[in-house]
Amino acid sequence: MKLDLLTAISPIDGRYRGKTEPLADYFSEYALIRYRVRVEIEYFITLCELPLPQLKNFDHALFDTLRGIYLNFNEENAQRVKDIEKVTNHDVKAVEYFIKEEFDKIVGLDAYKEFIHFGLTSQDINNTSVPLSIKEALEQTYYPLIEELIAQLQQYADEWKDVPMLAKTHGQPASPTRLGKEIMVYVYRLTEQLRQLKECRMTAKFGGATGNYNAHHVAYPQYDWKEFGNRFVSEKLGLEREQYTTQISNYDCLGSVFDAMRRINTIIIDLDRDFWMYISMDYFKQKIKAGEVGSSAMPHKVNPIDFENSEGNLGIANAVLQFLAMKLPVSRLQRDLTDSTVLRNVGVPFGHGMIAMQSTLKGLRKLILHDEKIEEDLNNTWAVVAEAIQTILRREAYPHPYEALKALTRTNKKMSEETIHEFVQTLNVSDAVKAELMAITPHNYTGI
């Protein structure tokens, strides 16, 4: 069966491919190979810049030509690497052999080919390529999308900042709030967690077979290979080298990244559920698109499917992110291979997260504020001003104010404006205080 959108096992590459296409540049097999080629080429160039004695005569004018190997890397090149891998049964060695083939196409480079992948182990390439792909995926796809979501929420918060709304705690009426402020809660939370995500250090392992630069040092003991590695990883890759490692990355900093992403996802799940509830409460209507069907049986249905889709995808993303954060830092002795297959799945939570954020945005942009229903609920719930009244009575040293309001409002009888005002008139307080109390309504008792 040919692989296409209909035959793909994962919905990320099937049903939702249109939403996740940009991630292929960072997390596909093709992308991983390209990143590996990039790291190998930049490493070779850095050895030339050192220079190693055998590379001192390498023509620096050829650096752009070498960088062209990964800048112009295409699917045909990636397939060549896969063909080589069928023989080597080793993915990183296949990349090395591919680069050597590319060197053969450039006159005069034959003498330098053995300095491709010089002194390195596969994880020096993988544990730089993967964090680099994550870093660039965050910067070029994830951050812009989450910032677009925050901007949409900010727009609604500004637009509805003066709309009073009945709050619900424990599912029951509570002191009124403002719709714009409730949306600002999510703007604040997402902005703060995005800041923390951006502050996560993006680190890489680069130190030879067991993290000690054994091969480098035995061949060229005159060089400070730790300083070389620090400079290469920082200046050429924009990452930070982990100073003490086994054969593989410690993955602690990647764990921080995944945990930060999970917190952001959890906030969006909370947002999805809240707007789902607001729609259920009829505080929002949804824009209807001609031709769409909400139910195969019930023609009237207009369901909050975008928020539900988002919630489901974020649940999957969080499960994988939690596993990645817990599993990757654990490896037997100086290394086992379990991280290898796990690392190939780092794009999965990105994919589900990208699907989710686009769905949340779509759901938000369908919203139509139903002012009448919000106002109706406020008008029908005068009991919520009890807090205001008892607080002012406390200020006035009125005896047992809380208990008085509790006796009035904690019944199964509906509290109306008339009921509240009649109660106020019975209070032994000044006319000025009575007027102050009478002026309080569910519409204006919204705090600051």
What are these regions, as identified by a protein language model?
Residues Y43-T46, E102, L149, L153-Y156, ...:
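Amphipathic alpha-helices that form helix-helix packing interfaces
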